[in-house]
Structures are given as C-alpha cells and as structure tokens.
Amino acid sequence: MAEVTTVTGMILSAMPVGEYDRRLVILTKEYGKITVFAKGARKPNSALIGVTRSFIFGTFEVYRGRDSYTMYKASAKEYFENVVNDLNAVCYACYFAEIADYYGRENLDASEMINLLYITLKALGRGAVSHELIRFIYEIRMIAVNGECPDFFTCHECGREDNLYVYSYSRNGLCCKNCATNVYDGITLSGSTVYTLQYICLLYTSPSPRDISGS
C-alpha cells in the first residue's frame, strides 16, 4: 500500500459507487480539492459509514493512487447536525458546498475557503441569522477570497475613496458622486451598505477556538 497521508478538510459531496463504496470530494487544507474513494463505507459494520457524508469536517487518512485517493481512516471533528437535520438549512449548505467545489482546485491552498465554509455552516446551525443574509455574506466573501470581488473601495472612474454610493454592473465596482452621472446602469447604495460590503471583503475568516472545538 502507498504511504498514508493525513489531511484536514471538509467533505463537499458524497456519492454512492458500486454496491458498498462512496466517492467523496473533500476540500483539504493541504492539497486543495481532492477526490477520495471510501471502499466499503456503505456497509452497516464499516468504521467509515458515519464519517463519509457531506459536510463532515475532520481529519482523513488517505493514500494516493494514480488519479484519486483512497480513504484509510477518518476522524470527524464536526458533524453540523443542526444543519443536516434542517431541510432549509441543508439546501443552503449544498449550495455553499457547490460554490466551494467550483472554486476548489487540487494542490492549491484552500485554508481560507475551508474556514469560510466552516463558520458559514456554524452560522446556519445556530439559526441566529437569516439564511438569506448568510448566503449573501458567503457569496461576497467567497468571490473576494478568490480574487473576483468588485472594487468596493475606490471609484472606478477617478480613483477617489470617498463619496462612493453608486454601484455599476458594467464597471464591476463603485463610482463616486461626481462620476455617477456617467453611469447608465448605476444602483444607488447607502453609506452603511457600502461600509458593510467593504467590511465583508476584508473579513478575517479563521474560526475561533470555540468554533474549532465544536462547542
């Protein structure tokens, strides 16, 4: 057997393969997005049956094959039970996982995306914030992490950093009061909205020790 490697990450999706196996897509801190086969994981007496479903965060012992990995052992640190037991929340979680899957690449550092997904699912499970608001924050932060966020800090036309209050789709950013007259597709935003967008883009997404412990 090839050398066993331990990775930390979150299972984005789990699909049945054959009679007893599962095909997993895991976003890992060490190797980015990887495909892992969990052999026999659907057998009733398998040690992997409870730790190879979507949204499980933990450590996974895997060994690499030519095109994919095979799971040897897994240890779950967070099951997100409050999410998977709520139909509405799990629908949002699936959407968030799809976005992470879209941006994830093998051998690219995915630490910040994992942290973002982790604290987002935590927020979903707590239920203190509306799912729709969580979705908006996640979307903006995810595109910011991956370098695709609109410029919310300077005017697209003149570069000034104050009086920004018009968003333009065609310019993919904000325009100041003076330049807004040249914008045909502008949407007027309040100062608090602009500040919130800027804050989300700069948000530090590492989980707190309380979150990591799962308490």
Give, region by region, the residue ranges found by the protein language model:
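A broadly conserved sequence feature marking short terminus-proximal activation segments
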Residues: 99-152
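A residue-level signal for conserved active-site and pocket-lining positions in enzyme catalytic cores
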Residues: 96, 139, 172
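Small-residue-rich helix-loop
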Residues: 168-174
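A surface-exposed, charged beta-strand/loop segment in the N-terminal or early-internal portion
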Residues: 1-115
